Amino acid sequence: GEVDMLSNNTTLTLTRDTALGFDFGAVTYYDGQGFLVPKKLGVKSAKELNGATVCVAPGTTTELNLADYFRGQKMSFKPVVIEKVEEIRAAFFSGRCDVYTTDASGLYSTRAANVPPPAKADDFIILPEIISKEPLAPAVRHGDQQFADIVRWSQYAMLESEEYGIDSKNVDEMLKSENPTIKRILGVTPGMGKALGVDEKWVYNIIKQVGNYGESFERNVGMGSPLKIDRGLNKLWTQGGLQYAPPIR
C-alpha cells in the first residue's frame, strides 16, 4: 500500500499480470530490448557480438531475452550480472563489460545523461537490432478495479485527444466544438466522468495540465527532450504506429 501506481520501465507479461497481485493499465510505451556499445568496439550489429561480455540486471525479462537471442544466433557471451542500475552503468563505462543491454529507452537515457567525462554521448552507439517486445505499462494493486480503470482510461484519454487534435494549447477552444466525440471527450456532453467515478472535466484537466500523448512523449523522451527518441511504434495508429485508444463513449 505504499505505492498507488508504479509507472516505470515495467514490462507487461502474463505472469506479472496473473501471479504477482498486479493489474496493468494501457501500454504507455512500446519498447524493445537493445544493445549499447562503445564506438571503439568497432561493431555495427548485434550479430557481431559473439564472445562479448554483457552487463545485465538479474531477474528481468532482459536477462532471459539476452540468453534467447544469443542462443538463437548461435553465439556465446559472458554475462556480468549486476543488480543495481547505477552499478551496471559504472561497470559498462569502466570497461568491465563490452555491452550494456536493457530496454532501448533506458539505453537512450543512459547515453544522454550518464556518460562520465571525459567521454561523450557520441562515443557510444545503440545497435539497430531490437530483440524483444517490451510493452511498458503502469501497474496498480490487483483488486481495486475502479482505480485500475481510471489509470487505464487516463492513458486512453491522452491518445484519443491527440487523435482528435485536442492539445494543451487549444483545449479551451475545443470546448466549443460541435463534434460529438470531442464533446464527450471533454465532458461537454456529460456521462463519461460519472462512469469512471470522477469529475466530468477529467479529460479536460489532464490535457490542460499535462497535454495529450504526443505532447507528453515529445517533452519527456522525444525530440523536445535530451533523449531525442523517435516515436516509432508509439505513433498513433493513423500514422503507422501501435498507439490506439478504445472509444470514449
Description of each model-found segment:
Residues G1-E48, S105-S132, Y244-P247:
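Acidic, polar ligand-binding/catalytic clefts
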Residues R219-R249:
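Conserved C-terminal helix/tail region of periplasmic/extracytoplasmic solute-binding proteins
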